[in-house]
Amino acid sequence: MTLTRLRACATAGAALAALTLGSGQALAATPHAPHPRPYTVVDLGTLGGTISSGIALDAATVVGSSTLPGNTDFHAFAYDRATRTMTDLGTLGGTSSSTVAVQGRYVIGDSTTADGDEHAFVHDLRTHRMTDLGTFGGTGSHVNAISGDTVVGSARTTGNQGEHAFAYDVRTGLMTDLGSLAGPSGVSSAAGISQGRFITGTSDVSTAPDTTQHAFLYDLRTHRMTDLGANGGASSQATAISGNTVVGISRTGSAPAPDAVHGFAYDIRSRAWTDLGDHMIAHLQVSGHTAAGTDGHTAYTVDLSTGIRTPLGLGQGSTGVNGITGRVVVGETNPGPLAFAYRTDTRSSTLLPAPGGLYSTASSADEQGAVAGTAATTTDPDTVNSSYHAVLWTPRGH
């Protein structure tokens, strides 16, 4: 893990989305026409530099990263939506930090240490304390999600010989090695957690002659890791979890398309695997019974209870999906990028305004439909997008 990844995360909102093209059929499609819904936009500012990026939010807080004076380093920040103040969360002794998510009093992310390594952290907004989650004997760790009192991610093992998924309890400070489907020598990582109990991710599977990766489900109550398989294909990868549903991608590994990629949804209760086809192969997300993803050009949602697939209908360019919360899907459309918010209940799409310039990206939404992201803030004769700041979009009337 390197500082390069940290900085890429911090400036993701200001970069153009790189999308992999795909094609194919998946489920039934329902067309719709976009209907604009007004949003107000607030420039969240910076920590003294000229660049900031909004990554995630909840009802009280927006988190992201910002440059310091001189634009040499990025620090994680928390923006209080009530007081409209931005706080520098600092680092674990290194020069840079970035955020991944926020839930109530806890912000999770990654930071460099004094040794130049990268470690996962939890920052408590009440105590103003950043806790280093450490490793399993190696030099680095990375955090991906939080649910309830549990944080999940991956950490390097002794001698950096491997990397294992972990679960960290913010109450006890206990970090649990979830192992891998291939035993102690295998590699695994956790992508998400649901209900404070079910963790999903991807792990090596010991097969001859090669090592194959499969999606897994880990139950914190039974301490059991279950191989979700690949539905007859060659490999699978879990990307997200919500409620009792895991989503991800699988490779078919069969002729005539041995490397064909399909999206999937897995029901934890029934253990049923649903093939979402080759329209849902990138940035696959899930919230409740709705999955969202893209084929690399067009973004779609799928109602997992009916099987109906709906294109987001945002024009002729490519569309990327960055997140889904409740009934709101967010991402960006290109050329641009231009941030959008799409509501699954009304099937309406809205291009979100930038405070200045043109370009913007949307990273995540909260349950009320507010959106965090990054947007151009200045317009001048030489460049219409000379500065990018973290922003908060709020539906009017909320």
PLM features: residue spans?
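Secretory targeting and sorting signals
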Residues: 1-30
